[in-house]
Amino acid sequence: SEMCIRDSVCTVLGMVIERLAYKPLRQATSLAVLITAIGVSYLLQNLALLVFGPNPMSFPSFVSIPSISLFDGQLILTGETIVTVLANIIIMLVLTFFTSHTKMGKAMRAVSEDRSAAELMGIKVNATISLTFAIGSALAAIAGVLLCSTYHTLMPTTGSMPGIKAFTAAVFGGIGSIPGALLGGLLLGIIEILGKAYVSMELGDALVFAVLIIVLLVKPTGLLGKPMREKV
């Protein structure tokens, strides 16, 4: 199907980017990797602008589920929204099981916590990181399809703000915690909607980042994040 093709293309693209842009930075600082990630995202966005142009294109929805009306029409859940929520829950459960109960998942956790120790234990660090990028790219493709299906439009800059908010949700919920990322995204979405409804349409996004700053000041590890223990 078309979705499988999109997913495969994004997976391969993610692995190529990892090999070209991130593998040379294995021993670099986290800040260097973050700056590289921002640079790569802008590079891909501008390449898409050159190839496809800035004009929005229609994106047909693949969801055939009818909308559901609740509370006498005060709340309407579209089919795309229902599928997105269900997909997020399923992906969270699968990823949690994968990282907790499979050999490769445990290897990913080991590499993320202590790369040098993981390598000494016989874990293939490069292969593990490449697999992580492949899984992340595949999930990004699924998220992109769900996003474009919801708004029925597609353009090179469509994923800019959602990408920033996704990173914000991960930090909000706790880096390294899969349920935390889902919880962070849910809470940020509620804050944004309530802010736009009761405060100001223009300040909706600003409120999201303001709440993030407050949470990080109070609990730097995020809502479900665990503090790192320094070994002496």
Predicted regions and their residues:
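Membrane-helix interface segments
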Residues: 1, 27-31, 178
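Hydrophobic core segments of alpha-helical transmembrane domains in multi-pass membrane transport
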Residues: 8-13, 38-48, 87-96, 137-143, ...
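Transmembrane-helix boundary motif in ABC transporter permease subunits
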Residues: 10-28, 180, 184-185
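Hydrophobic/aromatic residues within transmembrane alpha-helices
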Residues: 21-22, 43, 117-118, 171, ...
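Transmembrane helix-bundle core of multi-pass membrane transporters
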Residues: 24-101, 128, 194, 199, ...
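Helix-loop-helix "hairpin" substructures at the membrane interface of multi-pass membrane proteins
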Residues: 74-154, 178-184
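Hydrophobic alpha-helical segments embedded in the membrane of multi-pass proteins
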Residues: 141-142, 155-175, 186, 190, ...
